[in-house]
Design a protein with these regions (language model features):
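Short, surface-exposed, charged amphipathic helix/loop patches that serve as local interaction elements
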Residues: 11-94
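Short acidic-hydrophobic surface loop/beta-edge motif
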Residues: 1-8
Length: 94
């Protein structure tokens, strides 16, 4: 699957149904107190789990990108997996 981040196409693995359900649960846990009360550590762990799903070797696959861009890649990937990205909404007719 391809995602686009700041004009760059990034190739990531597709997500299985069980992985998607797990990611949805983690997302709900991280955001349970609202977006203003998200702890950075919890958010980064969520992105780390996303990286483990998206890439065979996240350390190696992401090492050529600056840290801030890595976060953008993983956030875009997570939103795509959860069906919350603009691209996913368009494909679903939303």
């Amino acid at each position: 699957m391809k995602i686009e981040v700041e004009g760059q196409e990034i190739l990531v693995r597709n997500i299985s149904y069980s992985q998607k359900l797990g990611l949805q649960g983690e997302f709900a846990d991280v955001y349970r107190n609202g977006t203003d009360n998200v702890k950075q550590k919890d958010f980064n762990l969520l992105l780390g789990h996303t990286a483990e799903i998206a890439f065979n070797d996240p350390d190696n696959d992401l090492k050529n990108h600056e840290y801030e861009f890595q976060l953008k890649i993983l956030t875009a990937c997570m939103m795509n997996y959860l069906g919350l990205s603009d691209t996913e909404k368009k494909e679903d007719g939303g």
